[in-house]
């Protein structure tokens, strides 16, 4: 039994959910998201809850059961509350600026990095903290990982771009011979 898959998802007020041909459609205001289950699981809407059930009893069906339930829950959370990731920039001369759909990064290279944000994602910069917001958990995480990948934190001084809650394991530098 999938412990995640058997939990129903409560549909919040203001969110319209419909199921057509194994495709879940979520709508709230101008947000419209779809989740195609590709026929791997049975989906029903009962008493204001989305209920998932596996198609068969094999291992693959049970895996899809929990996966699609988690994906649907992330969509509901995304269109109601949204997702955020925060990145912190450490280093002399390292800066960031949000200019519309472009995130401009100065990370010690000879050139500026102009990162174009995908649709549905917005970024804001407050001193040395970059906040990435969006309604799709996967896209927000992907953008944060790509921005961090431009200059990952190094273990000696901790310079670079890191997640705000991330802890960098520091190394001792060279010691002189006596």
From Swiss-Prot:
GO term, biological process aspect, one: cytoplasmic translation
Q: Name one Pfam family in it.
A: Ribosomal_L6
Q: Does the keyword GTP-binding apply?
A: no
The UniProt GO MF terms for this protein read: rRNA binding; structural constituent of ribosome
Q: Which GO terms describe its cellular component?
A: cytosolic large ribosomal subunit
Q: Which UniProt keywords apply?
A: Ribonucleoprotein, Ribosomal protein, RNA-binding, rRNA-binding
Would the keyword ATP-binding turn up in this protein's UniProt record?
Answer: no
Quote the subunit structure annotation.
Answer: Part of the 50S ribosomal subunit.
NCBIfam families in UniProt: L6_bact (TIGR03654)
Protein purpose: This protein binds to the 23S rRNA, and is important in its secondary structure. It is located near the subunit interface in the base of the L7/L12 stalk, and near the tRNA binding site of the peptidyltransferase center.
Assigned protein family:
Belongs to the universal ribosomal protein uL6 family.
Under which name does UniProt file this protein? Answer: Large ribosomal subunit protein uL6
- Recorded source organism is Campylobacter concisus (strain 13826)
